[in-house]
Amino acid sequence: MSACISPSDALLARRLIELTQAGLPLVADPWAWIAAQLRLSEAETLALLKRLRDAGVIRRIAAVPNHYRLGYRHNGMTVWDVADERIERLGRLVGGLSFVSHCYRRPRHLPQWRYNLFAMVHGRSEAEIEGYRQQIRLLLGEDCRADEMLVSSRILKKTGLRLAQKEERPC
């Protein structure tokens, strides 16, 4: 993928980000709303989004639930030491579990950090997330050489890209 886009798409992309950086509007048809704000048709807006995705400017558009407001106040990043040659298969198994929100591979930093497979779980209690950890441990079986669970000590709010507003300059 190339991050090169046309100058006109770059201007539209900036406006699109400014319009949506706080989230998509809660309207019946957010694409129609965005199209109207950009002074484009819906088809042109969707084509713009596709071009931006194809160029690697946009990776994805997705709903991001607030786990805390949904009652999931306990989080655990489970970390696993598994054989590097088996991590792809094992990661797919773990990532496919319904209670794993995201799962990925990270480099080891030996001797301080031996873990290479990470899986985030959310629950309504410490016991629930510990139960999820046990389920992952059972799934990995003998492939799991060691594991730990890192728990959140405070809430960190994730945000998307934020652009500074352009300064208005007098003529």
Swiss-Prot record:
<keyword id="KW-0456">Lyase</keyword>
<comment type="subunit">
    <text>Probably forms a complex composed of NirD, NirL, NirG and NirH. All proteins are required for the total conversion of siroheme to didecarboxysiroheme.</text>
</comment>
<dbReference type="InterPro" id="IPR050684">
    <property type="entry name" value="HTH-Siroheme_Decarb"/>
</dbReference>
<dbReference type="InterPro" id="IPR053953">
    <property type="entry name" value="NirdL-like_HTH"/>
</dbReference>
<dbReference type="InterPro" id="IPR040523">
    <property type="entry name" value="AsnC_trans_reg2"/>
</dbReference>
<dbReference type="Pfam" id="PF22451">
    <property type="entry name" value="NirdL-like_HTH"/>
</dbReference>
<comment type="pathway">
    <text>Porphyrin-containing compound metabolism.</text>
</comment>
<dbReference type="GO" id="GO:0006783">
    <property type="term" value="P:heme biosynthetic process"/>
</dbReference>
<dbReference type="Pfam" id="PF17805">
    <property type="entry name" value="AsnC_trans_reg2"/>
</dbReference>
<dbReference type="GO" id="GO:0016829">
    <property type="term" value="F:lyase activity"/>
</dbReference>
<comment type="similarity">
    <text>Belongs to the Ahb/Nir family.</text>
</comment>
<protein>
    <recommendedName>
        <fullName>Siroheme decarboxylase NirH subunit</fullName>
        <ecNumber>4.1.1.111</ecNumber>
    </recommendedName>
</protein>
<comment type="function">
    <text>Involved in heme d1 biosynthesis. Catalyzes the decarboxylation of siroheme into didecarboxysiroheme.</text>
</comment>
